[in-house]
Amino acid sequence: MSEHTTTPQGREIAVRVEHFVRDVVVPFERDPRWTSHGPSPEMVDELRSLARAAGAMTPHIPAGRDHLSHRDTAIILRAAGLSPLGPVAVNVAAPDEGNMFLLGKVASLEQKARFLAPLLAGRIRSAFLITEPAEDNGAGSDPSMLRTAAEPDGDHWVINGRKCFSTGLLGAKVGIVMAKTAGGATMFLVDLPNPAIRVERVPETIDSTLPGGHPTSRIENLRVPSSAVLGEVGEGFKYAQVRLSPARLTHCMRWLGACIRAQEIASEYAVKRQAFGKLLIDHEGVGFKLAENRIAIQQCTLMIDWCAGVLDSGASGTTESSMAKVAVSEALFRVADNCVQVMGGAGVTRDTIVEQVFREVRAFRIYAGPTEVHLW
């Protein structure tokens, strides 16, 4: 991304975020409060307090301003991603980043004041309840299989169903629930926690960056007023695309930053570690892997910039974001794998964040739609 496609404001914010992540967030990577289900609530609060003090909170949506361009957002989220904890710290992590974008586009003024404002301030977290358990033959990559249903009852709706992989549900204060209604699907805004939404389990997954984990929950007779409808009744699938196309790309932005950091760590290791009488970097097998990574990182950067330009033009970017998600997720997995391989035994330990980036990027090939679904 060059000065021809980004603004001075975007570049200045990206530099500020990068300094904050490298200087302040990186030392937290060894904090024991970072669990298998993400950083603890206390750790999130501490990181966000530091982000506010540094002027790095929700940096892609400056106070009193609209969302920056997708191209400016790309360099900012890439900077945030230089630590796996960076996006959480500066409030650009999934699912909150995508939910804020959706609410900014679709929510009523009252809903924005009640739900969006505290999200933008980083005071609360959110969850997006759309995916359903496979054992129920529910909606996964195919949203048309949606089983959770909402029935009208006077000026209220009653919702029943099960959800899974609702990232961040534990500890979230607002949820966006997708449910079947007559004539289509509808999104509902729900205050959390709610006794009608019961967490059944929080599975252990290979990723561990996002607070609140990826719970499975049962929704039983959840009663919400008609004012809880997000947008229009029956337009849920349309709104999902409003959210998902940009969200696919912001995943790419964040994990590009993480893989840049992994490449830095692996390169530093290769120029210090010796084997067979010379530095690792002087062995072609190692040098080639790091060179291939440099090429892949540049290709990902250009792919993201191209797709961001499509979104900035006002196009939906459905096809383009699928293309970018496939290309970037597959390339970054190879980058992370090469970094582990270059570092050998050190690469599979938790002495650095390289092994974590590898695990997170592996999950990225599934999250926001598996590669095979986007290709199809």
Annotated model-derived regions:
Residues 141, 145, 193-225:
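Flexible, small-/acidic-enriched active-site or ligand-binding loops
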Residues 1-84, 93, 106-111, 118, ...:
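Alpha-helical interface subdomain recognition
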Residues 122-133:
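A short, Trp-centered hydrophobic/proline-enriched beta-strand micro-motif
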Residues 160-200:
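A short core secondary-structure module
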Residues 105-107, 151, 177-180, 189-191, ...:
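Short beta-strand-to-turn element immediately C-terminal to the catalytic PLP-Schiff-base lysine
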Residues 90-110, 135-136, 140-142:
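N-terminal glycine-rich flavin-associated loop
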